[in-house]
Amino acid sequence: AESLIEVLDAIRDFFDVTDDCEITLETNPGAVSEAYLSKLHDAGFNRLSMGCQSFSDDVLKTLGRIHRSKDARESFAAARAAGFDNINLDLMFSVPGADEDVWQDTLDQMLELSPEHISFYSLQIEEETPLYDMYKNGVFAEVTDEADRKMYHSAIECLKSSGYEHYEISNAAKPGFECRHNLKYWSLSDYIGFGKSASSYIDGVRFTNATDEGYGKGVLMERDFLKNSKTRNMIESSDAEFAKYKYSEFHVNDFMDTASEFVFLGLRRTAGISFDEFEQLFGKRFADVYSGRRNEIEPFIESGDLIEDENGLRLSERGFDISNKIMAIFV
C-alpha cells in the first residue's frame, strides 16, 4: 500500500488534482484485505476495479484464474467496508463450456452485489496461450457467434432492466458512475502514462514507454537533455538520443489519423459522435471529410446498423454486433 500511496502523493506534488478526481485502483479478488483497502481509500483512492470475470468456479478454472467466486464476494464486501462507494466488476462471457444459463447466473450474482459499474467482454482465444492449445487439441469447441451475441445482448437487457445505463460497447454504469478515464480515451482527450510500457496521448502524439531497462536510462538522459536544451517541444526532441531508449513507440498523428481516431473511438459510445463537435475540433464538416467513403457508410445506415441524424452518427444495438466492420471504414 505504501508504494501506491507514494505514487499518488508524487502526482499531487506535480499536478493539480481536483477534490472530485476519479482515482481508480485495480485489483483481483482474494488479493486484498479490508485493512489494505482502507489504507488506500484513506489516502485518496476512491474507485476500485476488480477482475472477477465470473461467479462460476468452473469458468474461473477454465480461465486459469487462481481465485474462486467466494473470494470475489468477500473482496467486494471488504471494499465496501473500507469505504469504496464506486466499484467496477469485470466480467467475461463466451467461455468454452459455459452456456447462457451459466452466464445468466453470473449476471444475477453480480446484481446482488450491486456494483456501480460493469465491464463485460467476450473471451478472445489468443495464440500462444494455454486456452489456445486446448482449443487446437480439441479439448473444447469455440463458442459460436450466435451464442456469443445472445449472451452479449442478454447482459445489456439484464443491466438496463436493473437501472444501469449501457453507455459504451462493453460498459454499463449506474447514472453518474461512468468511468471517467475511459471516457477520456473514447473522446480523444489527452492523457499521460508513467513507467515502463505506459502509453500516452498528448497533442496528437501517441507514444509508449519502453518495457526494458533502457527506459530508466532514457529518463535520466532526458533529464540532462532538458537541462541543456531550449526546446520543450515533444516532436522536435523525439529524434534526441534519449528517445531511442525511453520510447518503444512514438507516432505523430496527421489530420486523417486524428479524425479517424475521433470517429471510431467515439462510435464505441452509445451516444456516438457529434457532427458539431467534429467541426469544432477539425475545422471541417464530417460529411466533407468522409465524402469519399459515403458509399461504404450508406449501406450500414440503410440496414439500420448505423443511425445518422442532423446531430451525429451512432451505432444501433444491432450495429454493436458488427462494430469492428463498421469502424474499419474510418481506420
Description of each model-found segment:
Residues 301-311:
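A short, conserved structural fragment
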Residues 1-287:
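C-terminal scaffold of the Radical SAM
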Residues 2, 294-298, 321:
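Auxiliary N-terminal substrate/complex-recognition segments of SAM-dependent methyltransferases
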Residues 318-331:
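Short, amphipathic alpha-helical interaction segments positioned at domain boundaries
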Residues 312-316:
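Minor-groove-contacting beta-hairpin "wing" of winged helix-turn-helix DNA-binding domains
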Residues 278, 294-303:
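Basic amphipathic alpha-helical segments that dock to polyanions
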